[in-house]
Amino acid sequence: MKMKVIAMLAALSLTASAAAAQELPRKVNNVEVLDLDGKPTKLPYWGEKNLMIFYVDPDRHKQNNDFTVELEENHRAQGDNIYGFGVMNLKDAPMVPNGMARNMAKKRTAKNGALVLADQDRILSKAWELGDCNNQFVLMIVSK
């Protein structure tokens, strides 16, 4: 009987925490992550434009590849009122060294002109209460 109560309480607490993480929309604050050279930087155009942010796990960088390539090649995530960019979730990619992931992103952005930033310590996912982003391709819209 005690085990059933404990299991039910554990399930309830997990459900409640997951539900809290999914409550939208909510106010978020700008965070400081790293540029591809490893220097601290804030998210661009904060409060100036609507932002389309791709929060990507480098272990699973091919998720939604067709969608991402379409946006990059046709600059569909850029305009007078919107700016799109990527943030690599490096903490959840332990098999990919941070420097290697940043160098791969540098090569890709040199070709397509996109902006990619690096989050080495889940700063963005913690600050914005995104929950578990491991192996996920998270697309976020942040309004100005």
Which residues fall in each region the model found?
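Bacterial N-terminal signal peptides that target proteins for export
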Residues: 1-7
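Bacterial N-terminal signal peptides
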Residues: 7-15
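N-terminal "domain-start" segment that seeds a small globular fold
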Residues: 21-41, 62, 66-67
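Short active-site neighborhood of thiol/selenol oxidoreductases, capturing the structured segment around
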Residues: 42-65
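Loop/turn elements at helix/coil->beta-strand transitions in domains of secreted/extracellular proteins
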Residues: 48-51, 79-83, 111-113, 136
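Structural microenvironment flanking redox-active thiols in thiol-disulfide oxidoreductases
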Residues: 61-109
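Short, internal strand/loop/helix patches
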Residues: 85-87, 102-135
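A short, hydrophobic beta-strand/beta-hairpin element that forms part of a small beta-sheet core
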Residues: 136-144
